[in-house]
Regions:
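N-terminal cationic and glycine-rich segments that engage phosphates or anionic surfaces
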Residues: 1-122, 132-136, 205, 232
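A short alpha-helix capping/helix-coil boundary motif
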Residues: 27-31, 89-91, 127-130, 159-161, ...
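Short, surface-exposed recognition loops or helix-turn segments adjacent to catalytic cores
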Residues: 123-133, 164-166
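Positively charged, low-complexity, intrinsically disordered RNA-binding extensions
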Residues: 136-237
């Protein structure tokens, strides 16, 4: 198994366990998708993907429909996607993806978390190169062979395919998302969820005490409502 498999296994139980946080995150994704491509999932591939993700975390259908309706209102502000890069204690690189309607607030908050936890907020480009930007799809495994899926989807950019109790996972470079989504839909393969992740190219092992220092920063970042995802180069235990 490759890095994507190990990365997914280590993170599976650690991040985004709070359902309310997941709903907030998906609500913002819906707003951004509707603002970009309109409220019709049939003609908006990004919105289709977000709705699938909402189903995957059991977000009520009413919540999804309200979010789409709200996003369609011209008075509804848009969210801007902003990436922050920096270092936690002990040389651990941190990459933070946010979706904000108030960049001044978000910058101030993120900077304060780094400062309070003895980290340092860096400049654009300072750590992003340490992560591979990937896309992923979880599909219904019923009647499918992971090895055949891997062979079939190599032509669309798939790099890793593996299965677990929840289905078959396909990992590919970020730019392959559209081609794989279109191919899965064309072949009538059920997409359970999809998304993007940044996988560290190299990780660093810390002592339990050092890891605790880093976790303090990760927790502060992940609790912020503007934060969508947090990635780091600490080896997950």
């Amino acid at each position: 198994m490759g890095r994507a498999f190990e990365f997914r296994k280590a993170r599976k139980m650690k991040r985004w366990s709070a359902m309310s946080k997941a709903f907030t995150r998906i609500g913002k994704d819906i707003v951004m998708a509707v603002k970009e491509g309109g409220p019709d999932p049939g003609s908006n591939a990004r919105l289709r993907a977000v709705i699938q993700n909402a189903k995957a975390v059991n977000m009520p259908k009413d919540n999804v429909e309200r979010a789409i309706k709200r996003a369609s209102d011209k008075s509804q502000g848009d969210y801007k996607e902003v990436i922050f890069e920096g270092y936690a204690p002990h040389g651990i690189a941190i990459l933070v993806e946010t979706a904000t309607d108030n960049n001044t607030r978000t910058v101030a908050n993120v900077r304060s978390y780094f400062n309070k936890c003895d980290g340092s907020l860096g400049t654009s480009g300072s750590v992003v190169f340490m992560f591979d930007h990937t896309c992923n799809f979880r599909i219904n495994a019923e009647g499918l062979d992971p090895e055949e899926i891997e062979l079939e989807f190599i032509d669309y950019g798939a790099e890793e395919v593996f299965s677990d109790d929840d289905g078959i996972l396909i990992y590919a470079p970020f730019e392959s998302f559209g081609a794989i989504q279109a191919a899965l839909e064309e072949k009538n393969i059920e997409i359970l969820s999809s998304g993007f992740e940044r996988i560290p190219q190299v990780t660093k092992t810390l002592s339990p005490e050092e890891a605790t220092d880093v976790e303090k920063l990760l927790e502060k970042l992940e609790e912020d409502d503007d934060v969508q995802s947090v990635y780091h180069t600490m080896e997950e235990s």
